[in-house]
């Protein structure tokens, strides 16, 4: 059997980088993406330093842009000839509320993440069908089920992604292609550290107090690591996860209270 090929978006930092490193440990051929060429080249160097024999292709570009997306998938097909795993990992839009949201920003967020994920799945699945195998993992978030008052648009778009993913999973299941959503909670990434700063400013408290306040709302009393999230993604990308599809799985230390 040929080595599996995985395409990881947003792989220059945080969860995306951790997933790329984890899949490299498991001997996947990798296509890694980020908007910043220098940053993603640095990740390639990290992978090759640990796995000199690894196959790593860098394709820089903004995956929220339709034309960039089309070009990158064309390159994956021409340079790899196959695609087995897709990690959809694009950040959402800026915080907003129902009172201050506007149509322009809502439309931009919908295009930036929701439409981009669905289009990427459409393009990736056409390649996966050639080998009757595929693993599609959408990085979403718990806001889809427990909306945040200050994340009005993102909460709504995440719910749309969960719904679309469930629908798509039914269509692709006969082709042995699974589609699942991975929903991180508070994970120690740059985005989390920005959130800590916002809590500090809002409450006029120290960084330590802000982090303690956040951790107090998590049953495990700590934030997660990108590596813990990557371990779950790697399992969903594996042969062992062959009967898991159409699911929404949280890596959040028990934060989500709904069932």
Swiss-Prot record:
Pathway this chain belongs to: Antibiotic biosynthesis; bacilysin biosynthesis
Stated consequence of mutating residue 158 to A: 5- and 2-fold decrease of the catalytic efficiency and the affinity for ex-H2HPP, respectively
Cell location: Cytoplasm
GO terms classed as biological process: antibiotic biosynthetic process
InterPro entries: NAD(P)-bd_dom_sf, SDR, SDR_fam
Cellular component terms per the entry's GO annotation: cytoplasm
Keyword Cytoplasm part of the UniProt annotation: yes
CDD domains tied to this protein: BKR_like_SDR_like (cd05344)
Induction trigger: The compound guanosine 5'-diphosphate 3'-diphosphate (ppGpp) is essential for the transcription of the bacABCDEF operon and BacG, and GTP regulates the transcription of both this operon and ywfH via the CodY-mediated regulation system.
Keyword Cytoplasm set for record: yes
Function summary: Along with the bacABCDEF operon, BacG is involved in the biosynthesis of the nonribosomally synthesized dipeptide antibiotic bacilysin, composed of L-alanine and L-anticapsin. Bacilysin is an irreversible inactivator of the glutaminase domain of glucosamine synthetase. BacG catalyzes the stereoselective reduction of exocyclic-delta(3),delta(5)-dihydro-hydroxyphenylpyruvate (ex-H2HPP), adding a pro-S hydride equivalent to C4 position to yield tetrahydro-hydroxyphenylpyruvate (H4HPP).
Recorded family membership: Belongs to the short-chain dehydrogenases/reductases (SDR) family.
SUBUNIT field: Homodimer.
Protein name: NADPH-dependent reductase BacG
């Amino acid at each position: 059997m040929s080595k599996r090929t995985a395409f990881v978006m947003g792989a220059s930092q945080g969860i995306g980088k951790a997933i790329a490193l984890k899949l490299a440990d498991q001997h996947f051929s990798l296509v890694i993406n980020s908007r910043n060429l220098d940053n993603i080249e640095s990740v390639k160097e990290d992978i090759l330093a640990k796995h000199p024999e690894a196959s790593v292709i860098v394709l820089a570009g903004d995956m929220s842009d339709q034309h960039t997306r089309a070009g990158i998938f064309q390159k994956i097909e021409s340079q790899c000839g196959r695609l087995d795993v897709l990690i959809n990992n694009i950040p959402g839009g800026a915080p907003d509320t129902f009172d201050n949201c506007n149509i322009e920003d809502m439309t931009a967020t919908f295009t930036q993440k929701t439409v981009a994920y669905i289009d990427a799945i459409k393009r990736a699945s056409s390649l996966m069908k050639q080998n009757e195998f595929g693993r599609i993992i959408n990085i979403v978030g718990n806001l889809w089920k427990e909306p945040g008052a200050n994340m009005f648009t993102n909460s709504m778009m995440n719910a749309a992604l969960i719904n679309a993913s469930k629908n798509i999973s039914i269509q692709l299941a006969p082709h042995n292609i699974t589609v699942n959503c991975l929903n991180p909670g508070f994970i120690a990434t740059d985005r989390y550290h920005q959130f800590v700063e916002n809590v500090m400013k809002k409450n006029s408290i120290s960084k330590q107090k802000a982090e303690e306040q956040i951790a107090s709302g998590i049953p495990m009393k700590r934030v997660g690591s990108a590596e813990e999230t990557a371990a779950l993604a790697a399992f969903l990308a594996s042969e062992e996860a062959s009967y898991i599809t159409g699911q929404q799985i949280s890596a959040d230390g028990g934060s989500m209270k709904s069932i």
